[in-house]
């Protein structure tokens, strides 16, 4: 049984300040669209963020692929755009080391992710210490609420994130109700009977393409939302192959929102 409560209903009862804030943004903008913007220059990145900003609740970054990255030149303008357009930031870092190491990776180094990214994510392969390490780092460098997504399922062909691995990743998520806000997953992860309300964010969503030749497999917006996804993650479908980001941004925003309204019996 998938989640049928509305975003405002879930926000009211949710233990995570970050999740409450995200639900509020989603409701106010009528958007459950996350734009995945993987480009190589700060200029192109910021231009796409500014163009897509009105249509999204979340922007997903791989900040380490930007060749001319700097905190001052890349992150500070990104934060201003997040304020201008009212969206949150999700750095898709996919942490996968022991707690002490990820603590340093998250808070320090060249990227200082915990100082600017509202949400990040992690694999469960090293056990529950990864959650503790990331939570400690967040509390030490930021006064703003932070949230963690666990990688329970992936959209790529041949992914090993399934079965017992997925189950044990869910068990890791249960160790921290405040910091772990949900999953990167292809399906609903349950937990409501135990008092958990996890946000499900789903990559590999496309209105047109079925794959990319490199293992990515696309599913339709209506399919993933009906299956329990709360936020659809779209990348090249928004700005690749000569597409108009404004047109595609509104197209995906509308499709995602209508699928949510249908799942929650609002239409």
From Swiss-Prot:
Any one GO biological process: 'de novo' UMP biosynthetic process
InterPro entries referenced in this protein's UniProt entry, alphabetically: Aldolase_TIM, OMPdecase, OMPdecase_AS, OMPdeCOase_dom, RibuloseP-bd_barrel
UniProt catalytic activity: orotidine 5'-phosphate + H(+) = UMP + CO2
Listed Gene3D superfamilies: Aldolase class I
UniProt signal peptide: none
Spans traversing the lipid bilayer: none
GO molecular function: orotate phosphoribosyltransferase activity; orotidine-5'-phosphate decarboxylase activity
EC number: 4.1.1.23
Keywords: Decarboxylase, Lyase, Pyrimidine biosynthesis
Pathway: Pyrimidine metabolism; UMP biosynthesis via de novo pathway; UMP from orotate: step 2/2
Catalytic residues (UniProt): 94
List of residues binding substrate: 38, 60-62, 92-101, 218, 236
SMART domains, sorted: OMPdecase (SM00934)
Sequence similarity: Belongs to the OMP decarboxylase family.
NCBIfam families: pyrF (TIGR01740)
Protein name per UniProt: Orotidine 5'-phosphate decarboxylase
Organism: Wickerhamomyces anomalus (strain ATCC 8168 / CBS 5759 / DSM 6766 / JCM 3585 / IAM 12210 / NCYC 432 / NBRC 10213 / NRRL Y-366 / AJ 5027)
Organism ancestry: Eukaryota, Fungi, Dikarya, Ascomycota, Saccharomycotina
Gene: URA3
């Amino acid at each position: 049984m998938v989640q049928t409560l509305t975003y405002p209903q879930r926000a009211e009862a949710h233990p995570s300040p970050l999740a409450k804030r995200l639900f509020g943004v989603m409701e106010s903008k009528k958007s459950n669209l996350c734009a995945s913007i993987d480009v190589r220059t700060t200029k192109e990145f910021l231009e796409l963020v500014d163009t897509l900003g009105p249509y999204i609740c979340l922007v997903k970054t791989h900040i380490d692929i930007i060749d001319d990255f700097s905190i001052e030149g890349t992150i500070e303008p990104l934060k201003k755009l997040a304020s201008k357009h009212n969206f949150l930031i999700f750095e898709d870092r996919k942490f996968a080391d022991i707690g002490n190491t990820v603590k340093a990776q998250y808070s320090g180094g060249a990227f200082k992710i915990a100082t600017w990214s509202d949400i990040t994510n992690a694999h469960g392969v090293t056990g529950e210490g990864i959650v503790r390490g990331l939570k400690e780092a967040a509390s030490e460098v930021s006064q703003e609420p932070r949230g963690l997504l666990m990688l329970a399922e992936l959209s790529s062909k041949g992914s090993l994130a399934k079965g017992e691995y997925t189950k044990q990743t869910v068990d890791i998520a249960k160790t921290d109700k405040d910091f772990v806000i949900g999953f990167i997953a292809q399906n609903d992860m349950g937990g409501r009977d135990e008092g958990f309300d996890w946000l499900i964010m789903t990559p590999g969503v496309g209105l047109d393409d079925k794959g990319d030749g490199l293992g990515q497999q696309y599913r339709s917006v209506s399919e993933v939302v009906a299956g329990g996804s709360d936020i659809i993650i779209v990348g090249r479908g928004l700005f690749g192959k000569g597409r108009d980001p404004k047109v595609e941004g509104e197209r995906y925003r509308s499709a995602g929102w209508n699928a949510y309204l249908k799942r929650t019996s609002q239409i």
